[in-house]
Amino acid sequence: MQINCISFCELLHLFTDDVNRNNEILKGACEKADFKKVERLYIGSNFCSRYFLKYVESALKGIAKLTEIESGALKVTLCVPVFSQLYIDSAKKLIKSILNEYSFIDELTVNDFGMIEFASQLNNIRLNVGRMMNKDARDVRYAEYFNLARTPEVFTLTNSVLKNYDINCYELDLTSRFLDVKNVNENVAIYYPYVFATVGNICEFAGVSLPIEKKFRSNYHCAYDCVRFANEYRNEFGNEYLKVGKTTYFKVDDFVVKADKPYRMVYEPFDGLKSKGEQK
């Protein structure tokens, strides 16, 4: 059985204090995903600490006023990226504050081992392993590899590093067109239709509006132009790519999930919601 979820990670900036607009954003995402009912939202960022720290609080204020949140029909998973030493203390403080303020958040998704240790010490919150921790190779250009049925290797972590932690769910990408989780005991959440291919350290969009001598500098302040631009690419084989912030995704519309118990499908509504620039 498929459990319908929608991720607004990397799309936090869309939410404002306009209740009607926020409800329309959710409605539009559900229509795009062809969901008659959605059971969970994913909020935050999996890939950019600066984006998370700047937008998550204002977004949650808007999301808290969604009709389905106020009625108790929707629960929320808070996703957090990897934080550098520069931001780690402020990030932990912010995460604790958010979890204390918003009771509709009942899960925390983390993307590195250090944050797993931090999150495991929090009360009344379920812990998820984020998609950044699944290191499986992924490249849609190599059809003979991508079209093989495979089980993600991240589950081997449960028998080693993660065996001492109470993990609620593993979040995955479609690293294979035929994703086999049939013999997996753990709960899984699968993001689609975009698969993250790679994440860079230096963000192209951080300095779109900056002079050339200040572009591509990881230690320079961010202009947050990722909220205004995204790049689309297509190769000669018809594969579609999308670059949002530091992250490059490829699109997979045709896929099969083999499972013998309920699993989450997490729709990413980049299409139609993300303002795209003209650069291709």
Regions found by a protein language model. Name each.
Residues 1-65, 74-280:
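Active-site pocket-lining/capping segments in soluble small-molecule metabolic enzymes
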